[in-house]
């Protein structure tokens, strides 16, 4: 939702302050396929394995989401 940096619904999330819906100090992310222990995963880390004719998707090191490989 507008103004939220993370989902307030899970008070057990160590990356998110459930009272403010903001990331805790030092956290880069709270969830996502490329978020590990509140930090963005390293660029080149596989976040979605290829199936069939598909190709692997990789973390970009600057976001928590798993961007689709442009060669799909």
From Swiss-Prot:
GO terms of molecular function: toxin activity
Domain Disintegrin, chain residue ranges per copy: 1-72
Gene Ontology BP terms: venom-mediated suppression of platelet aggregation
Keywords: Cell adhesion impairing toxin, Disulfide bond, Hemostasis impairing toxin, Platelet aggregation inhibiting toxin, Secreted, Toxin
Domain of life according to the entry: Eukaryota
Tissue note: Expressed by the venom gland.
Subcellular location(s) per record: Secreted
Motif Cell attachment site mapped to chain: 51-53
Disulfide bridge partners, by residue number: 6-21, 8-16, 15-38, 29-35, 34-59, 47-66
InterPro entries: Disintegrin_dom, Disintegrin_dom_sf
Main location: secreted
Gene Ontology annotations for the cellular component aspect, listed alphabetically: extracellular region
Keyword Disulfide bond attributed: yes
The family this protein is said to belong to: Belongs to the venom metalloproteinase (M12B) family. P-II subfamily. P-IIa sub-subfamily.
PANTHER family listed in its UniProt record: ADAM A DISINTEGRIN AND METALLOPROTEASE DOMAIN, ADAM METALLOPROTEASE
Subunit field text: Monomer.
Note: The disintegrin belongs to the medium disintegrin subfamily.
Record function comment: Inhibits ADP- (IC(50)=66 nM) and collagen-induced (IC(50)=100 nM) aggregation of human platelets. In vitro, inhibits adhesion of endothelial cells to vitronectin, type-I collagen and, to a lower degree, fibronectin and laminin.
Entry protein name: Disintegrin sasaimin
Gene source species: Cerrophidion sasai (Costa Rica montane pitviper)
């Amino acid at each position: 939702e507008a103004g939220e940096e993370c989902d307030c619904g899970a008070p057990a999330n160590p990356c998110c302050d459930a009272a403010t819906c903001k990331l805790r100090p030092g956290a880069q992310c709270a969830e996502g396929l490329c978020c590990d222990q509140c930090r963005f995963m390293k660029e080149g880390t596989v976040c979605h394995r290829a199936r069939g004719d598909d190709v692997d998707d990789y973390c970009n090191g600057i976001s928590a989401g798993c961007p689709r490989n442009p060669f799909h």
